[in-house]
Amino acid sequence: MFIVSKLLALALEPLFWTLLLLLGGLIALTRRPLLGRRLAWASLWLLLLSGWVAVPNTLLHALETRYPPPADGTDLRPFVGLVVLGGGLSDSSLWTSHKQMALNDQAERMTMAVSLAQQHGHLQLLFSGGIASLGGGGLTEAQRAKIFFDAMGLAPSRTLYEAASRTTFENAANSARLAGVDPHQRWLLLTSAFHMPRAMGVFQKAGWNVTPYPVDYRTAGDPSWLAYSLHDGPQRWQLALHEWVGFYAYRIAGMI
């Protein structure tokens, strides 16, 4: 499942298909010039389309608004802890090469976790994340998270770490097996808002009693249909397609 998910992520990259069409067009030009030109034009149109951010923003907005965050002033005393899903930390090589902590564009998963833990001293913090790269090696995300949370002043007695998971499905299954964790008690589930529908489905299917705490929003209200960026567009297309395809793939596989 892990390898399939990585191959699927590559297949959902708009620029991958742009390059594939362009290469196919160049190869076809020698024997079938008409086909070659059509493929080359298709690659150009796909590249231009990938910069139109309104469509992926609409897809992301639909995911992000499915689970609203808890209202201000919500009493969190009934919750025993906070499950934080990996994804907010930069690659292990950056940590080891520069001897510094490094967060990425999903950093709110980490910063909000610290904020909640500091505001609500009774909450146990459970971080779940292993090595999500095909090559493996280096510090697991849980090891990097421990360095970060320790540096932020969280007491080690309040933190638990699950370091084997590479997918959302494994996050739910492996975290439930940790000593001292009762998934039937009330937990907050913290992850990026666009990832929350899939995460909630998986955790609930695995028997967890979780309440969503979405962070890391990428959209705000109705998208502008005139917005265009060849820098942001392909990234947002990839993110939106990855989450929607992942959601339905998990549903078909019976994981949610």
Locations of regions flagged by a protein language model:
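Extracytoplasmic/luminal low-complexity segments enriched in Pro/Gly and acidic/polar residues
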Residues: 216-218, 222-228, 233-256
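Structural signal for membrane-spanning alpha-helices in multi-pass inner-membrane proteins
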Residues: 25-29, 51, 250
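Membrane-embedded alpha-helical segments of integral membrane proteins
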Residues: 1-29
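Hydrophobic alpha-helical segments of integral membrane proteins
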Residues: 3-8, 55, 59-63, 241-248, ...
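Membrane-interface helix-boundary motifs at transmembrane edges
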Residues: 29-38
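Hydrophobic membrane-insertion alpha-helices, especially the h-region
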Residues: 38-53
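A structural signal for short, hydrophobic/glycine-enriched beta-strand patches
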Residues: 49-230
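Extended, histidine- and acidic-residue-enriched regions that form the cofactor-binding/catalytic faces
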Residues: 15-17, 53, 254-255
